From Swiss-Prot:
Keywords: Nucleotide-binding
PANTHER family recorded: UPF0234 PROTEIN YAJQ
GO cellular component: cytosol
An annotated Gene Ontology molecular function: nucleotide binding
Superkingdom assignment: Bacteria
The organism of origin for this protein: Bacillus cereus (strain ATCC 14579 / DSM 31 / CCUG 7414 / JCM 2152 / NBRC 15305 / NCIMB 9373 / NCTC 2599 / NRRL B-3711)
Keyword Transport attributed: no
Family the UniProt entry places it in: Belongs to the YajQ family.
Protein's name according to its UniProt entry: Nucleotide-binding protein BC_1159
Function: Nucleotide-binding protein.
Length: 163
C-alpha cells in the first residue's frame, strides 16, 4: 500500500524581517526632506505595528514607506490588519496595524471549501492555526497547492512540511 503524502497550509509572518523592514523604513523617514522636523515613527509592540505622524497625509506616506520596505523583505502585506486613525498626544495621529499569525477558523473553512470543490481524493484537517492536506497522489497535492494559491484569500498562505 502506498504511503500518504501531505503538507501543511500556514500563514506566518517572520517577525525579524518585520523588525528589519521597520528599521530600514525609519532610516528613510529620517533622511527624507518632506519628513524633516516631523514626529513620524514606527514601533513594533509584540505583534502590533504602531505608526505615528503629524497628520493623516504624512501617516499615509509613512505607511507607503513601510509597505515598500516590507515587500522588499518578502513580508506578506495581506497579513496586516489596519485599525482606525486615532488622535495621539502632541497634535499627532496614530494608526495600529495588527500582524495576523496563523489561519483563523473562517479562513480555514474557506480553504477547506476551495479544496472540496476540486472533488479530488484528498483529506483536510484543521489543526489549531494551520490546515493539513493529505492524499495518496502527489499530483493531487500539487493541484491543491495551485488552487489555493490562485484563490483570493484575505491572508497570505505558505505551504510547509511537504512529504
Amino acid at each position: 500500500m502506498a504511503k500518504d503524502s501531505s503538507f501543511d497550509i500556514v500563514s506566518k509572518v517572520e517577525l525579524p524581517e518585520v523588525t528589519n523592514a521597520i528599521n530600514i523604513a525609519l532610516k528613510e523617514i529620517q533622511n527624507r526632506y518632506d519628513f524633516k522636523g516631523s514626529k513620524s515613527d514606527i514601533k513594533l509592540e509584540k505583534e502590533v505595528l504602531v505608526l505615528t505622524s503629524d497628520d493623516e497625509f504624512k501617516l499615509e506616506q509613512v505607511k507607503d514607506v513601510l509597505i515598500s520596505k516590507l515587500v522588499k523583505r518578502n513580508v506578506p502585506i495581506k497579513n496586516l490588519d489596519y485599525g482606525k486613525v486615532e488622535a495621539a498626544t502632541g497634535n499627532t495621529v496614530r494608526q495600529r496595524a495588527t500582524l495576523q499569525q496563523g489561519i483563523d477558523k473562517d479562513n480555514a473553512k474557506k480553504i477547506n471549501n476551495i479544496i472540496k470543490e476540486m472533488k479530488l481524493k484528498v483529506k483536510t484537517q484543521v489543526q489549531d492555526d494551520q490546515v493539513r492536506v493529505t492524499a495518496k497522489s502527489r499530483d493531487d497535492l500539487q493541484a491543491v497547492i495551485a488552487a489555493v494559491r490562485s484563490a483570493d484569500l484575505p491572508i497570505d498562505v505558505q505551504f510547509i512540511n511537504y512529504r
